[in-house]
Amino acid sequence: MIFKVFYQETIDEVPVREKTKTLYIEAESERDVRRKLQDRHINIEYIQPLEGAHLAYEQQNPDFHVLEIEQ
């Protein structure tokens, strides 16, 4: 399944909406997403599963690139 992860680049600062970034990752579950990203030291705000029409919509975005992290 593909997940969209909303995150801040640093853990040390208070989250600011304007600095929120996103990435797409393939994983089995939200827990699996967190496990795969744990070494990146980012502040994960929200993990959203993507499927069906929502996934098709996101795939139209030119910035849509799925991270494939093996762990």
UniProtKB/Swiss-Prot annotation:
EC top class, as a word: transferase
E.C. numbers: 2.7.7.6
One GO location term (cellular component): DNA-directed RNA polymerase complex
Annotated Gene3D superfamilies: RNAP, epsilon subunit-like
Domain of life: Bacteria
Catalyzed reaction equations: RNA(n) + a ribonucleoside 5'-triphosphate = RNA(n+1) + diphosphate
GO biological process: DNA-templated transcription
GO MF entry, a single one: DNA binding
Subunit structure as annotated in this protein's UniProt entry: RNAP is composed of a core of 2 alpha, a beta and a beta' subunit. The core is associated with a delta subunit, and at least one of epsilon or omega. When a sigma factor is associated with the core the holoenzyme is formed, which can initiate transcription.
NCBIfam families: PRK13667.1
Designated name of the protein: DNA-directed RNA polymerase subunit epsilon
Species name: Anoxybacillus flavithermus (strain DSM 21510 / WK1)
Gene (UniProt): rpoY
